[in-house]
Amino acid sequence: MLEKIIGKSGVEEFRKFWNKKLSLEDFKKIISFGILLALGMILFNCYLKYVTFNGELKGEKILYVKIDGSTGAVQKVNNKYLGKQASIKNTKNLSYGYYLMRFDVKKVVTKKEFTTIEGKIKGYKESKLNNFRRYILNIFDDLFMTEENLYAFSRAAVLGEKSEVSKDMKDKFKYTGLAHLIVISGTHISLVVIGIVKILDTVNLAYKWKYIFSLIALTLYCTLVGMSPGILRAYIMGAMMILARILFQQEDSKKSLMISLIVILVLNPYAITDISMQLSYAAVIAIIFVYPHIERILNIKFLEKMENGILKDSLKLTILSLCIQIVSIPLFLYYFEKLPLFSFLLNIIGVPIGTVLIETLFSITLLNILKLKFLNFIFVPVAQAIYNAFEGFIFMGSKIPMLQLNVAGKIDLWIVFVYYILLIVGIIFVRNVGFEIEDEIKKRSIKKY
């Protein structure tokens, strides 16, 4: 069976890989890596203690809070990070945005994994960008207030403001595997960069200046929506890609990924426990480290024989979505007690429609900021039509059984580690098989000549 899938050369490569004996040099490399890893963990732990709030949560404290709806996520206490996620109630009915506030802590309540800090807001100072956030939210108020779900989607997809997104809507997006479209992600960052570059192309701007302005726009946008760990990851990788083009350097996505992780952990060591960040990195790891090796083998076997077109692109998107799902499975099992099975298939249609919808919403936002409101009569009906199709697709998808399965209880953490160790071994094997097949094809072509 294995021979039919990967061929004789693949089976032979698997045997070599399995039976390979460690040399003294390999053993030295493993020991060196282990020592560096141990030192890194010790330094990280020391740094963690330095930036963590270790005092008693009682009395008046200075909180840095992100308000979203009826609650606010506590980012810092007295300019130090909490060792756990905590929230406060938005008793002042503050609008969406970031606030520095004096807070009189009365009680701390923890239920399961959720911590609520109860008390009184005694004073606050809001971020200067909050006014601009409100300005954009008012645009959606004027245009989509009567379209309940489109109104909620536009606020979430453009600004990351999810207070209007209903539980039913969230559940449908999660079940169909399209939840990444209602949070600010790498998709949004890419659309911002591509959109700015296309706009600047129309004014015939010099190559370097085009990307310099794109970097400025990207920085402003990410600052506006808030530099959460997932957004910061996408921003750093996007910024490094733009800088590579400005400096005429080769883009290196692997290096960008590692640098983004280091920067995020230096700025906020507790970001490593953030679920959205873990899912974000899992997706990017699948795109950078898993998919290219799978695609190489499939390309040799049959993809290169297919004509370029919708069918080939759809097949590639399906394989990419499957790779992302495979890498993300342990996180879904551990945090959500769900096993994704076939939800990746809906990405074939859902992602293109959702991407076009987000592009349209970005266009509407920009046109209204530039006071070109007379174009709303064209773009708003288009957005409504696309969203209706998108919502209909998600509704039908939510009725399909077996996209995800509920699992009784959270899996143990050691299972997650074992899964990823086996996945790393599998990636190395698939990579070696791909190189072996390519070498064999080259040898055959040389013999022909």
Locate the predicted segments by residue.
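Structural detector for short beta-strands of small beta-barrel domains
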Residues: 53-72, 101
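OB-fold/S1-family single-stranded nucleic acid-binding modules
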Residues: 75-77, 108-128
